[in-house]
Amino acid sequence: MMITKQSYKKLALMRVFVFSLSAFIFNTTEFVPIALLSDIAKSFEMESASVGLMITLYAWIVSLGSLPLMLLSAKIERKRLLLFLFGLFIVSHILSVVAWDFWVLLISRMGIALAHSVFWSITASLVIRVAPIGRKQQALGLLALGSSLAMILGLPLGRIIGQMLDWRSTFGMIGGVALLVALLMYRLLPSLPSRNAGTLSSLPVLMKRPLLVGIYLLVILAISGHFTTYSYIEPFIIQISQFSPEVATLMLFVFGLAGVMGSFLFGRFYEKNPKKFIACAIILVLCPQLLLFSFKHLEWVIFLQIFLWGIGITSLGISLQMRVLQLAPNATDVASAIFSGSYNVGIGSGALFGSIVIHQLGLGYIGFVGGALGLLALFWFNFITIKFGAK
């Protein structure tokens, strides 16, 4: 019996690992254009700010597609659905590799975004289902760790491959790794019937929960602020701080490494006081942005700011995801779809705001605008906490 229990625990951990690796792949491909922005712009003879709108397009497709596509797929067995999503993901990356102009690249990114919109709508609840008994929070933490590793390994490696070969090779490598992940899913995951996915009728019920709605608005505000600055951090480091491309790569690595710390801190401290944890995470996101321009030429200060910023954004994302699941236990997939949509409204809006700031004011001002949105997010969080009695 002991061997059976140990075998079950090992298999469950392997399944959680597959989901964590999947999160790594999806987050890497969503954000790797940030690390390749200058190279993509150069290859198509465009400005970085204009190419940055591909981040906005991707995010807004996810925002618009998350809920309706989740509802359309609500009754589909989850393992089969995941394998279909990875098939679409891989084919779209092949199109990215052969893209002969910027519009074809955008079309390929649309396919990836559609897969992304369903994947993140169902993954949080699935990783909890396959987790070892009593390890649900840790499983969610490992899922967040996969996302963080995308920043630690995915973005820097994507940038290195882009510099050594070209940006197309980066997308090709991501597609190849995705194929391996799909094979692991096919091999390791059991049949996963749809459960507590929720239906269209769940929406009015969820929208009557003011704290939940407030959390969604908080996500939009906080993530918009973050991506106003982060979407253009690579050109900021090179053009404004005037650091070398190698330093920019290292800073992206540090940002992702900080995400591991954020995942650890979530597992250690979130349950003790969720309100204070979320507030501290917001502060860690907004302060480095507000101070970014002031210390633009002090390399060690920028490294420190980026490290704290990375801790903050990872801690914030996973804690808000957990809060949503806690507030909507009877419709987890619908609630997660709205969360994913809200998050990507923030990504798209942030990338758009950043582009507008660059064109109207200049690249150096992105941190001020991003930080100001972060301040609004902090005020909003304090308001909904007091108004609706967050526990």
UniProtKB/Swiss-Prot annotation:
Coiled coil spans: none
GO MF assignments: carbohydrate transmembrane transporter activity
Main location (coarse class): membrane
Any one cellular-component term (Gene Ontology): plasma membrane
Entry's localization field: Cell inner membrane
Gene: sotB
Role this protein plays: Involved in the efflux of sugars. The physiological role may be the reduction of the intracellular concentration of toxic sugars or sugar metabolites.
Gene3D superfamilies, per database record: MFS general substrate transporter like domains
Keywords in alphabetical order: Cell inner membrane, Cell membrane, Membrane, Sugar transport, Transmembrane, Transmembrane helix, Transport
Family matches, as PROSITE patterns: MFS
A Pfam family: MFS_1
Protein name as it appears in the record: Probable sugar efflux transporter
Family: Belongs to the major facilitator superfamily. SotB (TC 2.A.1.2) family.
Membrane topology: Multi-pass membrane protein
Transmembrane segments: 16-36, 51-71, 82-102, 103-123, 138-158, 170-190, 210-230, 247-267, 277-297, 300-320, 338-358, 361-381
